[in-house]
Design a protein with these regions (language model features):
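Conserved acyl-donor/pantetheine-binding loop and adjacent beta-alpha core of acyl/acetyltransferases
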Residues: 86-130
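C-terminal "cap" of GNAT-fold acetyltransferases
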Residues: 165-181, 185-187, 193, 197-219
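Active-site rim helix/loop that mediates acceptor-substrate recognition in acyltransferases
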Residues: 39-67, 71-72
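Conserved beta-strand in the GNAT
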Residues: 69, 75-83, 132, 137
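A short, internal acetyl-CoA/4′-phosphopantetheine-binding micro-motif in the GNAT/acyltransferase core
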Residues: 71, 103-105, 136-143, 174
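Conserved GNAT acetyl-CoA-binding A-motif
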Residues: 129-131, 159-172
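Conserved N-terminal entry element of GNAT/NAT acetyltransferase domains
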Residues: 1-15, 19, 23, 28-35, ...
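Conserved acetyl-CoA-binding loop-helix of GNAT-fold acetyltransferases
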Residues: 135, 144-158, 182-186
Length: 219
């Protein structure tokens, strides 16, 4: 695509990365997990997400190094977050958990622990030694232009070069986000399973009570 550059994220991209994470967490709804689970306002959450990104921990969704930025005609258009699960011996869940525990107020962590039994009803483990596509976000003005496909393919190709034997890419999406499911199918993902919680309380905590796991196999 003429005028398109896909590059590594850097510290100057943090404001846009924070926006990306917030919008991905909401998944097209008004439910924001940093508020419902941790009890933070959106502004408090943004500041804490920024602080976690500044820790520069690799290989999870709160890592600057996990992001690629799409720039079209010198304007930031979107971003992806992806990483190789367990690349340095630790799971992304553990890395993210460590960042949350280190950064957020103790009261927020205790609140989340109380809600943990409910949240586990939708938890899907990441597969080790696979590429995990953590999130994809495009600004509204840049949607419907085919940028999602280019951004995802570029990021997968980059990670594949780091570990050539990788053959699987996974993405998790809330099942009611039909636009996202459709977009992932267009770029080669297939639905392999879904997980639904029967606990109605989860609808007050997360955007939906069902998650879909999708897989793209690499040659």
């Amino acid at each position: 695509m003429k005028g398109l550059i896909i590059r590594d994220a850097n510290i100057n991209d943090i404001p846009f990365i924070v926006e990306t994470i917030v919008e991905a967490e909401k998944s097209g709804t008004n439910i924001f997990s940093y508020n419902t689970i941790f009890g933070l306002s959106e502004e408090e959450a943004k500041k804490n997400i920024e602080n976690m990104l500044l820790e520069e921990v690799d290989d999870c969704e709160l890592s600057i190094s996990s992001f690629k930025i799409a720039v079209l005609n010198n304007i930031i258009a979107g971003a992806t977050a992806a990483w190789i699960e367990g690349f340095q011996g630790l799971s992304s869940a553990m890395l993210k958990g460590n960042l949350l525990n280190f950064t957020l107020p103790k009261a927020c962590i205790e609140r989340a622990k109380l809600l943990s039994p409910i949240l586990k009803g939708l938890h899907i483990e990441h597969t080790n030694n696979s590429i995990q596509l953590g999130l994809v976000y495009l600004k509204k003005d840049f949607r419907g232009m085919g940028l999602v496909n280019l951004l995802i393919d570029s990021h997968i190709d980059f990670l594949k070069q780091k570990k050539m034997e990788i053959t699987e890419v996974y993405v998790q999406v809330f099942s009611n986000n039909l636009a996202a499911v459709k977009a992932y199918k267009k770029v080669g993902f297939s639905v392999i399973m879904s997980k639904k919680s029967s606990n109605k309380t989860i609808l007050n905590l997360l955007p939906f009570n069902e998650k879909t796991l999708m897989l793209r196999e690499l040659k």
